[in-house]
C-alpha cells in the first residue's frame, strides 16, 4: 500500500504540474508536495496520437506492476479508477483531431481571460509567474491555430456558423479596449498584496498593461484573422456524430463524462426516466395534477421572452430588494 500511494502521489504531482495554471489553481504551496518551481507554461498542446497512446500505456504498465489483491479497499478503488481512465485515455488518442479547443461555450478564447482574471496572488512570485503566462498568450494561440488548420485539412473543422460565433467572441473581447477586465482585476489583486511596495505595485500594473497590449490583444487579432481564412473548411453542420467515426467518438466522450459503461441509448433512457420522476415529484410538492402541470407549461411556452422576464421581475419583488436605477 505504501508503494502504491507513493506511485499515485508522484502521478498526481506530474499531472498537476503539467501546466502552471492547473498547478496554481490546485495547490497553494506546491513545494509541500515536492514540486519545484519551473518556467511558466500553459502546457503542451499534444497533437500526436501515438505520443498520447505511449504516455497512457506507460502509466498503465506502471499501474499493472502492483498486485491488486495486496491493496486495501481505498487503494483498490483508486486502482480501478486509474485503470479505467488510462484505458479511455489510450482509446481517445485515435480521436485527438476531433477535440475542439475553441468551443462556443467553454473554449480557450472565452475561458483564458476568465482564468487569468481569477488567478490568485499570494506573493510577489505569483505576480511574476502571471506576467510570464500573459506573455505566452501569442505562442499558445499559435499552437491552437496550427491544430485548427490541421483539423481543416482533415475535414474536421467547425462549420462557418460556429466560426462566426468564435470570431464574434474574440472581437467582443478586443472591443473592450482599455476597459478590459484584465487591467482592472490585475490592479485590484496587486493592490491587495501587502508584501509589495507602492512602487512595485505601480511597476507591475504598468507591466501588465504592456503585456496585454503587446501579447494578448495581438493573439486575439491574429486568431480572428486566421479563423476568417479558414471559413468554408467545415463541411459538417449536423454535429459530431456526422463526422467519420463521430458516433464512436461520441460514445467514448459519454464514457469519459459519466464514468459509466452503459450505451448512449441506455443513458438517454435513464435520463428520460429521471426527468419523469422529477416532474412527478414536483407535481406532488406543488399539489398539481398531471393535466394542470401540462396546462401551466403550455401557458409559459405561449408567452414571448419579454413577457416571461417581466413576470419574473414582478414575482421577484416580494423576495428581493428593488435594483438600483
Which role fits each region the language model picked out?
Residues 1-325:
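N-terminal maturation segment of proteins
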Amino acid at each position: 500500500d505504501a508503494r502504491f500511494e507513493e506511485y499515485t502521489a508522484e502521478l498526481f504531482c506530474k499531472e498537476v504540474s503539467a501546466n502552471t495554471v492547473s498547478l496554481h489553481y490546485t495547490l497553494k504551496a506546491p513545494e509541500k508536495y515536492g514540486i519545484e518551481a519551473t518556467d511558466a507554461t500553459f502546457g503542451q498542446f499534444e497533437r500526436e496520437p501515438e505520443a498520447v497512446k505511449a504516455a497512457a500505456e506507460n502509466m498503465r504498465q506502471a499501474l499493472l506492476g502492483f498486485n491488486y489483491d495486496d491493496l486495501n479497499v481505498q487503494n483498490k478503488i483508486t486502482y480501478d479508477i486509474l485503470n479505467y481512465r488510462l484505458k479511455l485515455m489510450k482509446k481517445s488518442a485515435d480521436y485527438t483531431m476531433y477535440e475542439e479547443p475553441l468551443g462556443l461555450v467553454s473554449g480557450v478564447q472565452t475561458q483564458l481571460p476568465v482564468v487569468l482574471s481569477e488567478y490568485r496572488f499570494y506573493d510577489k512570485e505569483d505576480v511574476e509567474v502571471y506576467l510570464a503566462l500573459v506573455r505566452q498568450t501569442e505562442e499558445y494561440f499559435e499552437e491552437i491555430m496550427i491544430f485548427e488548420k490541421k483539423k481543416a485539412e482533415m475535414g474536421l473543422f467547425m462549420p462557418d456558423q460556429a466560426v462566426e460565433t468564435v470570431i464574434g467572441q474574440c472581437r467582443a473581447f478586443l472591443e473592450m479596449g482599455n476597459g478590459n477586465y484584465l487591467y482592472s482585476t490585475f490592479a485590484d489583486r496587486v493592490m491587495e498584496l501587502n508584501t509589495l511596495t507602492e512602487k512595485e505595485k505601480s511597476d507591475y500594473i504598468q507591466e501588465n498593461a504592456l503585456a496585454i497590449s503587446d501579447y494578448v490583444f495581438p493573439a486575439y487579432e491574429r486568431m480572428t484573422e486566421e479563423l476568417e481564412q479558414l471559413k468554408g473548411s467545415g463541411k459538417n453542420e449536423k454535429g459530431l456524430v456526422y463526422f467519420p467515426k463521430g458516433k464512436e467518438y461520441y460514445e467514448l466522450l459519454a464514457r469519459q463524462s459519466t464514468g459509466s459503461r452503459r450505451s448512449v441509448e441506455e443513458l438517454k433512457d435513464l435520463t428520460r426516466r429521471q426527468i419523469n420522476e422529477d416532474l412527478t415529484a414536483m407535481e406532488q410538492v406543488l399539489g398539481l395534477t398531471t393535466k394542470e402541470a401540462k396546462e401551466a407549461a403550455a401557458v409559459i411556452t405561449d408567452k414571448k421572452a419579454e413577457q416571461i422576464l417581466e413576470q419574473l421581475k414582478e414575482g421577484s419583488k416580494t423576495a428581493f430588494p428593488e435594483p438600483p436605477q
